[in-house]
UniProtKB/Swiss-Prot annotation:
Catalyzes the cleavage of 5-oxoproline to form L-glutamate coupled to the hydrolysis of ATP to ADP and inorganic phosphate. NCBIfam families: PRK05406.1-3, PRK05406.1-5. CDD domains: LamB_YcsF_like. The keyword Hydrolase applies. This is 5-oxoprolinase subunit A. It is an enzyme of class 3 (hydrolase). GO terms for molecular function: 5-oxoprolinase (ATP-hydrolyzing) activity; ATP binding. InterPro entries: Glyco_hydro/deAcase_b/a-brl, LamB/YcsF/PxpA-like. The keyword Hydrolase applies. PANTHER family: 5-OXOPROLINASE SUBUNIT A, UNCHARACTERIZED PROTEIN YBGL-RELATED. The gene is pxpA.
Amino acid sequence: MRIDLNCDIGESFGAYRIGCDAEMIAIASSVNIACGFHGGDPDVMAVTVERALQSGVAIGAHPGFPDLAGFGRREMRLRPSEVTNLIIYQIGALQAFVQAAGGRLHHVKPHGALYNMAAVDDELAAAVALAVKRVDPQLVLYALAGSCLVETAKRLGLTVAQEAFVDRAYRSDGTLAPRNLAGAVITDPETAGTRAVAMVKTGCIPSMDGDLIRIDADTLCLHGDNPGAAAIAKAVRASLETAGIAVKAGFERT
């Protein structure tokens, strides 16, 4: 039994430092690197790619809405073509840094509001999936498990890694609880570790409303910018390995 453990990194920019990238890279099996729109800048992207390649983790682009002030977590209403183009732009930027460093881009995972909106909006899901396919149909798309983005991407012939979150609470419909709700962000390392093992071994976790929801995950996400992120990540990886679950990127590019 195995599971991919991914984390969002490279979100610092200019004088602003966000997250604990070095610690997260050492724990994860795949990483999602910001591409300059919600976070990141050229220097941060270059350094983060180099660190990821040295660690041997799978590297993915982490495109978001053009919203540095809101960290890409505010909804934006854009035409589908605009969404497709802004994702192509960001994938291209990160892909260039990866190739310049001698690596190969493995996957794409949308960020923040873009991720959440594409999980429930068919038109937006199609815009996201189309962007990935146009850049490189061999790229793996990381998407919320059970969401419309998963089905849309599969219809376009993309390989999809269905994602679950060990540091976020769920609503009964399988979507993530908004961050402004009490308890929406899991900050206790032991709780996060227990949830991770349950997700992999049983495929079920309780929602915030107490309902048991089904989650078939190929990859588990940890946020590098959450409070105590490094401690949570260490606890999750240790819990998985203690339970006999190997941590490894789940899909290989051909």
